Amino acid sequence: MDVDAEEKRHRTRSKGVRVPVEPAIQELFSCPTPGCDGSGHVSGKYARHRSVYGCPLAKKRKTQDKQPQEPAPKRKPFAVKADSSSVDECYESDGTEDMDDKEEDDDEEFSEDNDEQGDDDDEDEVDREDEEEIEEEDDEDDEDDDDGDDVEEEEDDDDEEEEEEEEEEENEDHQMSCTRIMQDPEKDDNNNDEYDNYDELVAKSLLNLGKIAEDAAYRARTESEMNSNTSNSLEDDSDKNENLGRKSELSLDLDSDVVRETVDSLKLLAQGHGVVLSENISDRSYAEGMSQQDSRNMNYVMLGKPMNNGLMEKMVEESDEEVCLSSLECLRNQCFDLARKLSETNPQDRSQPPNMSVRQHVRQEDDFPGRTPDRSYSDMMNLMRLEEQLSPRSRTFSSCAKEDGCHERDDDTTSVNSDRSEEVFDMTKGNLTLLEKAIALETERAKAMREKMAMDAGRRDNLRSYEDQSPRQLAGEDRKSKSSDSHVKKPYYDPSRTEKRESKCPTPGCDGTGHVTGLYPHHRSLSGCPHKDRVPPEILAMHENVLKCPTPGCTGRGHVNSNRNSHRSLSGCPIAAAEKLAKAQEKHQSCDVSKSNQASDRVLRPMCFVKQLEIPQYGYRNNVPTTTPRSNLAKELEKYSKTSFEYNSYDNHTYGKRAIAPKVQTRDISPKGYDDAKRYCKNASPSSSTTSSYAPSSSSNLSCGGGSSASSTCSKSSFDYTHDMEAAHMAATAILNLSTRCREMPQNLSTKPQDLCTARNPDMEVDENGTLDLSMNKQRPRDSCCPVLTPLEPMSPQQQAVMSSRCFQLSEGDCWDLPVDYTKMKPRRVDEEDPKEITPEDLDPFQEALEERRYPGEVTIPSPKPKYPQCKESKKDLITLSGCPLADKSIRSMLATSSQELKCPTPGCDGSGHITGNYASHRSLSGCPRAKKSGIRIAQSKEDKEDQEPIRCPVPGCDGQGHITGKYASHRSASGCPLAAKRQKDGYLNGSQFSWKSVKTEGMSCPTPGCDGSGHVSGSFLTHRSLSGCPRATSAMKKAKLSGEQMLTIKQRASNGIENDEEIKQLDEEIKELNESNSQMEADMIKLRTQVTITTMESNLKTIEEENKVIEQQNESLLHELANLSQSLIHSLANIQLPHMDPINEQNFDAYVTTLTEMYTNQDRYQSPENKALLENIKQAVRGIQV
């Protein structure tokens, strides 16, 4: 039987390649799964798939319905010949049991046989069967030629090609093949006649259909085991023996649409000759097919071969691959079942099927004595096996008892069968051929799928082998429980590969190509699918709920490595990163204080302010800055955000030891600043430090500007942070606690520098009375202290008011240990009176706290640039809010007055293609691919959101060429301007100050601490001047979730500061002038356009006039010609007198012509001789007129 299987497998493959599919069977190539629209097929880029093998819906349903089961060993035939009675008993018992019972019987019945059989016999028999394959194909070719089947004639050519490939193997067992051929002549004599009988043709074609499905399943099984590199192989001589073993571990989908459609087609075929099949044919077909196979296994006992136990172990891993072949298995069984039904009906009308059975048994009994276990059979055994199935007597009677009667019936049956018409024969043969072709193509496609999945499985197994050696154990450790199976290639849908299931795009109709995020043929989410617009709303809603960041409170914005609207992991979540850094900060609370002193002072540097150019300050010599490159910014921030600070244990009413920040070198500027250097905030406690989350570079509550000011001079400089309650509240809403700086506020004002403490120990504390605390770790209770806040806990306005109300003095050495925020510098009056202390009860958190220490001439919003040169790093006006760039970005963006999204300001830009990042939207024109090269964009200013501002380089005389940082025609800052760099270099060489822009530019800095001015929504300058469009302020405000009243207060403070700042007012006036200039330019453009329109209209009018003149000339010429013709006609007809009319003249010319026209039109009325003569005269007179 293996020869039959091998030959049919070769021929099936050739059919799939060579036989064209006719349009009539194209409908077979759509997915049969109910509810499947053809999308998500794992095997390729087709809009529709043709089977349930690669259908994701069918795969999912089978996985859910499939119950885990123990691997069942294959059914093994006995190695001894069984008599007819045992065959009958086996059939009857198996036919009455269900699938599960048969699996158990197989386990018990053949377990010993499997242990006793050897591996060597399997290998030898498989080799001999493969070598004898070509000889047997020749026998089939003879039979096919007699049948006259065109399709099988094409298959003969394929068999000849394969015969050349196996010519050497064929010669080794040539003698054995010849012996087999000598023993089969009577079978050939009985079956080489043409199939004139209709039912015999149906039986033959149905056998081919069943064999095609059976061979496809067998080939998948054989190739899978050959890839496992084991010394064991399946038996090739009986495919149905193998199918029995496989069915014990397959969960067959008898309700599959493939099976259902095929059975429907066969039912229609059966109805053509009066056979009615039951509706549950699909349910019965499997059990009957199993029982029939059991019967054949018992009859053909010489065909059996031992089975290896190693294969049974591997069947567990390969069972999933065979699940996809269950439909073909069912198809084969149903074909046999249909053939049997045909045979049960036909004996009533014709005696052919019983006769076939009789001939079968005669030949069978004759052939059995001469067979050996390694005997192979030609394709004629296919018909014999089918005849055995068709005959019910072969299952109920002994073949020996029926032998004589069968001989007597041969001739009669043949004569009856020859009466079938040739036309019905050809039609049926064509229909069955189409079905065979369709199944052949499906089998070939399934084979290609399995080969591809086997290659993928091999690569994954190689990766898994490395993981097995690593100490980290994966969740699926059961995949490597068997060491002998570590090298076996697992199928793509192996149950252990749970992470690979459903790895396809859920978009209907998407084949996996064009996914924006990866290099994989299939994508597993909707986020990057190019066909996302096809997704139904319910599916989209489901995925939107699933594919979200697991961080609580995260909306998906700001993910560091994704351009999706939502991120699905913590790896790139800014909030998760902030919490992680906060936890890391808490681990270092027990570190030594000296570690903080050893930290680099670069923590205080304005790392985010990478574009700011050094600006000379009122005649003082510039200090060359050391800027931090943007490329190293993230690393340095991460490095310095891990600075350790020491805390002692404390409670809500005690103070711990104050952490010391790295020193900042400053320079004495004025006596006023010197005097003010005495005052610091009283609340130098960990509780206040932990709340300054986003002010690592600021020593005060001033984490963000807006109605605040400060002065910073030298080591004896002073800092006034009284008016920064607004900033303190924003700092309290921070996520991180990357800074443990002290918030210090002035309390006692003095004009004498001697009031400073004489001790310089930076670790000493000073109480409100000016007494030094010489104890390093001493804790003092403070009744007025606010409760301790955690790093992630927002501080209430009342708490911040209390913190900023109590002040005390620190030693002179502490001046060097405080980080200075140079964005809030302002002059202080020496003779100001001391501020009063406030309590949370009589304090409006924003209003009074911000106004309490406002003095005459004081500005509530800081000067964007310091009015005095403070230190050698004064050119770095802006300082980062924290060491985390993500935290800075988030906290600042929340403080904007408007809630607009941080999107690119370029009109029509959706945020894609931005040069500088992976974000869903970009916030500036610097990397926008759609930014206009002309340098004009819409700017949203405070006064008029529709005003336009140029985005040109601010350096005077620069035309935008040669900018080092961009590819655009105009640049917006002097950081990369070659002209500015050249002038600055010349200024240094000549000793003169370099000013690339007027001093008014100094005021154009954002009041948000740490903001470098980039990404401002409403400005086109390097720095922005208010909180209204600051992305960092917007982000912080969103996180703080401030109420409307608080937001209004902040906006009022910001607006008040802008109104009171003369430089800002000057800038606003200039902006108004620019707006007026722009308006004038727009008016000029409108005028110009109007002039152009008028000119165009005038030219059109002239053209129309010229055309009219031409028309008039033509009309005049036509009138002249008409007058000439009239005169000629009058002259010619002057001598002709019409009845009842005067001679022709100019007065009666029209009437005369009308009469003539009527006469010639109605000549029937003028048939008299006189009228005819008149008409003839008129013709002669008019003949001489030239038109």
UniProtKB/Swiss-Prot annotation:
Zn(2+) 4 binds at C904, C909, H922, C928. Zn(2+) 6 binds at C1006, C1011, H1024, C1030. Residues 1-20, 56-178, 221-248, 343-422, 450-509, 684-708 are annotated as: Disordered. Zn(2+) 3 binds at C549, C554, H567, C573. One of its GO terms (biological process) is neuron differentiation. Its main location: nucleus. It holds the Pfam family zf-C2HC. Residues 344-358 have a biased composition (Polar residues). A zinc finger (CCHHC-type) spans 22-65, 496-539, 540-583, 895-938, 944-987, 997-1040. Residues 362-377, 401-412, 450-504 have a biased composition (Basic and acidic residues). Keywords: Chromosome, Coiled coil, Developmental protein, Differentiation, DNA-binding, Metal-binding, Neurogenesis, Nucleus, Phosphoprotein, Repeat, Repressor, Transcription, Transcription regulation, Zinc, Zinc-finger. Zn(2+) 1 binds at C31, C36, H49, C55. Gene3D superfamilies: 4.10.320.30. Residues 1055-1131 form a coiled coil. Residues 89-172 have a biased composition (Acidic residues). It is found in: Nucleus; Chromosome. Belongs to the MYT1 family. Transcription factor that plays a key role in neuronal differentiation. Acts by specifically repressing expression of non-neuronal genes during neuron differentiation. In contrast to other transcription repressors that inhibit specific lineages, mediates repression of multiple differentiation programs. Also represses expression of negative regulators of neurogenesis, such as members of the Notch signaling pathway, including HES1. This is Myelin transcription factor 1-like protein.
